[in-house]
Amino acid sequence: MSAALRVGGLVPLTTLDYPGLLACVLFCQGCAWRCRYCHNPQLIPARGEAQIRWEDVLAFLQRRQGLLQGVVFSGGEATLQTALPGAMARVREMGLRAGLHSAGIQPRAFARALPHTDWVGFDVKALAEDSDAITGVPRSGQANWRSLELLLESGVAYECRSTVHWQLFDLERLRRLAMRLRGVGVENFVVQLARSGRQLDPQLIATPAPQGAAALWGELEALFPRFELRDA
């Protein structure tokens, strides 16, 4: 099954995408959501124009043995591919840790990947009731939050992160999201400020943080055992 993994891009070395490890990133092709701030819209179709064969990925990893410590399966939405669990297992057989970037679009598929995963960067889009305005897909928030429950129950190491574009969030909405996350047991939360430039929705333009944002960052630092503010 792993031979069928559709990879639309590869970053050969990163210190940012898997905390504490030297890793490469595989951008898995395909996503069922249409997040307005998505900065990799070329990965949304199930099949892209620039595909990297799984055999070539494995050959690359073999050459990097002794340097790389982990592989991050990103997207797109990697869990939509049935080949993902087998691909992650193969990476672990090579002595590498398997990281996953996911929004848990389909909770059952997300659950199938978790046993093969060493760390998850989990994307919480918004409160469940607010998520459709970001993803463009009805009931996406319910799926997102159900997968978060599965992640917290699994014991797999994680960070939860929310991408914030100030045309889609205000301070109070972000505060409520953070309170809800802390209430369900999230201990590690990252706010990612959305990039300007290439994104799926051209109507989203660079928007400065509202007055009071600095005070909110202080609140979130006090709320979570681990909190970080970063650029997406």
What residues fall within each predicted segment?
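Generic beta-structure capping elements
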Residues: 10, 29, 41, 125-127, ...
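Auxiliary Fe-S-binding modules of radical SAM enzymes
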Residues: 1-16, 20, 166-232
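Canonical Radical SAM [4Fe-4S] cluster-binding loop centered on the CxxxCxxC motif
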Residues: 16-52
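Conserved alpha-helical substructure of the radical SAM core
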Residues: 41-71
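Flexible, glycine- and charge-enriched loops at secondary-structure boundaries
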Residues: 50-51, 137-141, 206, 210-213
